Amino acid sequence: MSSDIPEDEWLDKFADKLATLMYSRGYNQKSLSNATSISRSTISKYLNAEQMPTAKSIVNLSYALNCGANELIDFGHMIY
């Protein structure tokens, strides 16, 4: 059974996963912004666990990073 986690913990996990994938694929914030049409400031907020990603952003990030959405986000928990 899945457990609930606080939003800030979920955001921290997302930020870590995004940073790992981004740098391992040779992206920096500017190049990822160009590849996804997500503003550089928004990517910075994601990396600093300051903003919840939209579904559209998750799709665009997954496409640019050549990964599944499940590699970016944790589907095993509900967020509170």
Positions of predicted regions on the chain:
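A short, Lys/Arg-rich alpha-helix, primarily the initiator
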Residues: 1-28
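The alpha-helix within a helix-turn-helix
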Residues: 22, 33, 62
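Residue-level detection of the helix-turn-helix DNA-binding "recognition helix"
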Residues: 23, 37, 48-50, 77
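Short alpha-helical DNA-recognition segment
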Residues: 25-45
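DNA major-groove recognition helix of helix-turn-helix/homeodomain DNA-binding modules
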Residues: 56-71
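Short amphipathic recognition helices of helix-turn-helix/homeodomain-type DNA-binding modules
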Residues: 71-80
